[in-house]
UniProtKB/Swiss-Prot annotation:
Binds 2 [4Fe-4S] clusters. One cluster is coordinated with 3 cysteines and an exchangeable S-adenosyl-L-methionine. The lineage of its organism: Bacteria, Pseudomonadati, Pseudomonadota, Gammaproteobacteria, Alteromonadales. This is Ribosomal protein uS12 methylthiotransferase RimO. The gene is rimO. It comes from Shewanella oneidensis (strain ATCC 700550 / JCM 31522 / CIP 106686 / LMG 19005 / NCIMB 14063 / MR-1). Catalyzes the methylthiolation of an aspartic acid residue of ribosomal protein uS12. It is an enzyme of class 2 (transferase).
Amino acid sequence: MTVETFHPKQTTTLETPAKTLEAASADSVNTGNVATGNRIGFVSLGCPKNLVDSERILTQLRIDGYEVTNSYDNADLVIVNTCGFIDAAVEESLDAVREALEENGKVIVTGCLGAKENQIREVHPDVLEITGPHSYEAVLKHVHKYVPKPEHNPFTSLIPQTGVKLTPKHYAYLKISEGCDNRCTFCIIPALRGDLDSRGAGSVLDEAKRLVEAGVQEILVVSQDTSAYGKDKGGRTDFWNGMPVKQDITSLARQLGKMGAWVRLHYIYPYPWVDDLIPLMAEGLILPYLDIPMQHASPRILKMMKRPGRVDRQLEAIQRWREICPDLVIRSTFIVGFPGETEEDFEMLLDFLREARLDRVGCFKYSEVEGAVANTIAELISEEVKEDRYHRFMEVQAEISAERLARFVGRTMDILIDDVDEEGAIGRSFADAPEIDGMVFINGETELEPGMLVRAVITHSDEHDLWAELVDADAEDEVEA
């Protein structure tokens, strides 16, 4: 049994890629007896959370007997799953809708931007239907309206238990909740996706088990607010495999860590109970990797953002975490040019970077998001100043990142292979999340395959990536684990 394969096409406006369907050869794709005239094109934009929504829609389309195509010309209808978080993402989404309309003419829009139907209709009045984010049933209902459900034999067009995936076979995103209870002034996600709505722990663990049984070697846990998982459950316990499981992020992470795959946590809000996750990393249950967006370091700006404002406590926490788990890799994101940000505020941010010594850092220039409170709370910063601060920020962090990566030189590490080309293999260590962090290059090793987990000694580094050589299995006992 085979299904279509999806490959990333990197965008320039987002940290995560658009996903489009790549055609597989006729002899490698089993479409069963899906009738022609029932082909659906699909474009997925935005973050990994949106990617999971796309996977769910695509899975149901295949279950219903539709064929998914990579060609606008061959599609009877095109679905565009949009992002609407920042202006650049909105522009990209509207461009994708425009292209689909020009190339095909029959388009359904869903996703975060779909929550702003009037904005889409003003630009693209010919769109057939518009739904908001995680509106799976509504999307399928609209598809059935314009392209009737085909007659098909479900036994000849089987779908894996894991469903259709837009990621390579060896890693997958696992979304554990929807929405967010925080009200950061620069963000409109709660308005688009609602308040926190956690999945039951049993459901999450069932999905994770299916992924691992299907060969997934890395599970990337995502949500709008991962560390808040279960807060909305009121302390209720769920059950999995007949065992009670507390519905909080620490208990969930502990159970995920027992499944034998890498477990990587993303989008961790800096709640006090994040401390409880670090021992799990030190024990090796989950990867020693913490994606914790801090956004700024000026107490004044953090207060305006409605974010935790005790930077001294954050620095103390980072030191405490590293003492418990010395291998810990911390990734964060920050905003420069937030309304009202002074040069003094920005210098506080640079000072924080120099003291915190974070491993992986992303930086965004503040973008006015329609409906965000932050747009009107203080004077907007000019584009010239934002650009200058962005480059100064990245220059400081590049030096820090180079220093942090250099500590791996000489170490032997597990490397998960993502790709192999004529020059060798490209993989990632525990320190590297796919698509947003660096890579590990193993030159000359063209016989490796994606999904392999190999041992390699790190030979050198720069501010982004590592280079390595495979370790002789016979010498494994002589090298550092």
